[in-house]
Amino acid sequence: MYSSDLIEEVVSRNDIVDVISGYIKLKKNGSSYVGLCPFHNEKSPSFSVSQSRQLYHCFGCGVGGNVITFVMEYENFTFLEAVKSLADRVGMELPEISYSQKEQQERDLKTKLLEINKIAATYYYHQLKSENGQVGLSYLRKRGLTDETINRFGLGYSGQNSKALYRYLKDKGYDDDLLKESGLFTYERGINDKFWNRVMFPIMDINNKVIGFGGRVMGDAKPKYLNSPETKLFDKSRNLYGLNIARTARKNNLIICEGYMDVISMHQAGFNQAVASLGTALTPGQARLMKRYTDQVLITYDSDEAGTKAAMRAIPILKEAGLSTKVINCLLYTSDAAD
């Protein structure tokens, strides 16, 4: 963690009015500045910024804080990410961070979990290309995916043995306590792989590190799609599938889809700015994450009742994040072709 003196210097060199004015329009009102709150929908400005106190407060929704908390909330940053962003803004070079014992243990755990996820993703990928993975490969082929697309997204297959990955990782020396933290296993009836007989979709963060998985069952078992649980690495509400690729697409919008196959099919068709909300319920955190990379979002959820309702729920969330939104009419499609 950075010293309190260094953090205070970062804050003092970033005038809160200048910083917030880069995100929303502020108007001077007496000794303060006011504007429309970026954290909730409103027609009359209730968001106040005090230059003398270097604080902001919304009288509508109650949020408030200093320049660091504003950047954290608006950009969906961690505390350290916000400090680094503000330091970069004013050309400050930050020293290497010294961590407490607890913080270092947390970092070490996350490093190990990333290592396990990378091994698991590689294992699933090789399973897909093996004789045992033909059912998964056939599924992907029938949906028109090329080898290039399969490789680009690191798609895999989990196999039909419900203990295969567990044994594979145990043979590599990982202990049960660590494996339990990974979210890759269930414990209701002994230790079993969470994903088996499923086509696997590695979920990556913006730095292309595997933080979780999605799996589509081969057959009629339920649920059809299964995601990793929340772990030290994976928070579904703060990530978007495909953003690691889409953020470098250099397009003037992002396309939000419902599922993994929707995104992959979009990318293969040339729409490499497509992402998925890991389910139909878009969150404010995901909307703010998109705002980092674009000002416009195109919604392409399924045209069934659930998809339509999800799109209607998403529109105000995207608007609150400062994103303009358009809904693409998918009624020409009579079935979920990418399922």
Model-predicted regions and their roles:
Residues Y2, N14, N29, Q105-I119, ...:
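Phosphate-handling DNA/RNA-contact segment within nucleic-acid enzymes
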Residues L282-T283, K291-S335:
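Conserved phosphate-handling catalytic cores of large alpha/beta enzymes
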